[in-house]
């Protein structure tokens, strides 16, 4: 079974091959299931294949507390290479970084981004940060 080519593209950083991506939104409810809060979200977890060239871009982003970046996770069709889906993020801060190498499992880096804005197609979610 073929896999979908997915890449992480961030302003000023080398493009990376995505192994896993997850993001979610939630809305608080009361004990009866009725909405009691506004939708919340804006964090994206992304696992990428390590470049294995000593490139510390993602780590540098993590340890720079005021460094916001824009970018996208791009999903392309396997056969044609045409754009299938794009998740864009604006004013994203890297708030978690893990690098792991495991024998027979490979070498990867995993980051968590806290984003002011996430866009998936025609849907945009904006965190109203002060």
Walk through the language-model features, giving the residues of each.
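Glycine-rich, low-complexity intrinsically disordered segments
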Residues: 1-130
């Amino acid at each position: 079974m073929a896999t979908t080519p997915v890449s992480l593209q961030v302003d000023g950083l080398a493009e990376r091959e995505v192994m896993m991506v997850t993001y979610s939104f939630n809305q608080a409810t009361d004990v009866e299931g009725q909405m009691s809060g506004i939708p919340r979200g804006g964090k994206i977890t992304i696992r990428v294949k390590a470049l294995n060239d000593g490139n510390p871009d993602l780590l540098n982003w993590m340890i720079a507390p005021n460094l916001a970046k824009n970018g996208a996770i791009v999903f392309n069709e396997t056969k044609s290479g045409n754009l299938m889906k794009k998740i864009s993020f604006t004013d994203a801060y890297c708030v978690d970084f893990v690098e792991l190498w495991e024998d027979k499992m490979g070498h990867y880096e995993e980051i968590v981004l806290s984003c002011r804005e996430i866009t998936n197609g025609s849907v945009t979610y904006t965190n109203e940060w002060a």
